[in-house]
Amino acid sequence: MALDKLDLYVIITLVVAIAAYFAKNQFLDQQQDTGFLNTDSGDGNSRDILQALKKNNKNTLLLFGSQTGTAEDYANKLSRELHSRFGLKTMVADFADYDFENFGDITEDILVFFIVATYGEGEPTDNADEFHTWLTEEADTLSTLKYTVFGLGNSTYEFFNAIGRKFDRLLGEKGGDRFAEYGEGDDGTGTLDEDFLAWKDNVFDSLKNDLNFEEKELKYEPNVKLTERDDLSGNDPDVSLGEPNVKYIKSEGVDLTKGPFDHTHPFLARIVKTKELFTSEDRHCVHVEFDISESNLKYTTGDHLAIWPSNSDENIKQFAKCFGLEDKLDTVIELKALDSTYSIPFPNPITYGAVIRHHLEISGPVSRQFFLSIAGFAPDEETKKSFTRIGGDKQEFASKVTRRKFNIADALLFASNNRPWSDVPFEFLIENVQHLTPRYYSISSSSLSEKQTINVTAVVEAEEEADGRPVTGVVTNLLKNIEIEQNKTGETPMVHYDLNGPRGKFSKFRLPVHVRRSNFKLPKNSTTPVILIGPGTGVAPLRGFVRERVQQVKNGVNVGKTVLFYGCRNSEQDFLYKQEWSEYASVLGENFEMFNAFSRQDPTKKVYVQDKILENSALVDELLSSGAIIYVCGDASRMARDVQAAIAKIVAKSRDIHEDKAAELVKSWKVQNRYQEDVW
């Protein structure tokens, strides 16, 4: 039957109306399409961030800049919650994995989260450096960008959250539309997790109130599928037992002595010497020398050594008990990503035990965020209610969990009266427990005098709580285990480690390491005077500096004055490298002076490095007038600030200016590299 014009008009009108209706619902119905339209996918450059979003049908991008893994962990957890609560199609991305030349072409239907840490003296993390350069120097208009930023920083540092604030400012200046308030966390006050949770709540409010998203009940949806492989065992050559990466599993024909070595691929360095530096019975500090002669790994004086950790036997046993895995540690599992943008964070197939020992951060303090996320898997309703209550109240969480220094297993077993949490999927743990990341140590040797070895100096973090639980640092206790075994001291360590490693690859005292470059460097002109300030293990890189100048003198090079201010508790118990300093003085002569502050030597008077600086203000002022560069290493929370205040006081007096003006002058020296810090 033929259609007349009126019928045709009505049909066309209905089609348009229906299309508009579904288009509107597609935009607003988060359960079906998460609130944003998606463009067609297409093939192209794998480093093209926009192509990746289109190809994988994503409408929410979370970019992280992370040095220690915390920002990455936050990004992953937020991604899962955005998907579960609001149906957003999320993609977590490492800045370093993509190019951003066409980032200005991003469309308004994409939400972008920047979760970025500040590293060092207001610098971006290594993986965010190229994006930072692009945003600062090359980016044009970003008028179609919808974004928000969370910065991770430490208020004890001079440039607190500089990168988060800079990103937020530049993105706005270039036309971006911030859909949720900027947020920042402060590790210096110990409130990083709480700050993130507060910001996350604000983001969710913005999504609901400003962007009209409907919030759903939070439900765990795994990104990975886990299969237990009964047909495989740890003896199969393709099964990971905790090797750093695939190259170390399938190492036949692969030269593992050639770099580049970085956070994705370490060198297995042999520890050739260890030494206990303290004489105290209850405190320990180890000197460790890594042999790099078998590789092309290089360093320069002042760099950092990254040591790849593993967990202690005791913490592994407790974690396995908590989740009912005691009899499954040798069982092989295979993981497959259910989302095309999710990357399995370690080689697999792999055993449960290898994941727990080498890849999960099980020894550190449990966060309130994790508490809330795991409550639904509690072994009984009473524990679930208790967990939800404690996790929902930051004061109660602080008093009942944080102050007791509970790790994950400690907290869960305490709350459940030692009933195992057997209903927690292992996939959940892989996705929600932060992954083990390298620990960084200031190198205490000189690349001029120790070309083939790298020295580190580490105080062993170990204490026993009132209930008898050991609270231990991961790497420092591993190093202490090696020192005890290598020197056959007969001591009993607080916790124990597998020193042989996967398939015996760590035997004969080897550990995976890589070098991270640092800007904490001696002046290129060797005659420039230097003022070195480093109490405790803060003296580590300064020892390297002094050794460098000693070697320069031996090589016939003229050097400037070196003045070292060192501090410790007691001259007889924890004076680091006590015998060495006189040897250095004999070589450097009048170009070396050392002043020691002992905070607990005299019970009636505590003396700190800043006191010694003020006592020798005339010398300090003379050196500053001669163009001396100041180097400070150690505790950022108090020491670094007190030292800076002491220097400002000396400057104010010598130049007859107000201390506030002197403080600003000293602060400006940091920008000029006349005042350098390596603090934590």
Swiss-Prot record:
Residue ranges, Lumenal side: 1-5
Gene that specifies this protein: NCP1
CDD domains with a match to the protein in the record: CYPOR
Residues that bind FMN: 66-71, 117-120, 152-161, 187
Cofactor dependence: FAD; FMN
Positions of the Flavodoxin-like domain: 60-204
Protein name from the UniProt record: NADPH--cytochrome P450 reductase
Catalysed reactions listed for this entry: 2 oxidized [cytochrome P450] + NADPH = 2 reduced [cytochrome P450] + NADP(+) + H(+)
Location(s), subcellular: Endoplasmic reticulum membrane; Mitochondrion outer membrane; Cell membrane
Annotated membrane topology: Single-pass membrane protein
Cofactor note: Binds 1 FAD per monomer. Binds 1 FMN per monomer.
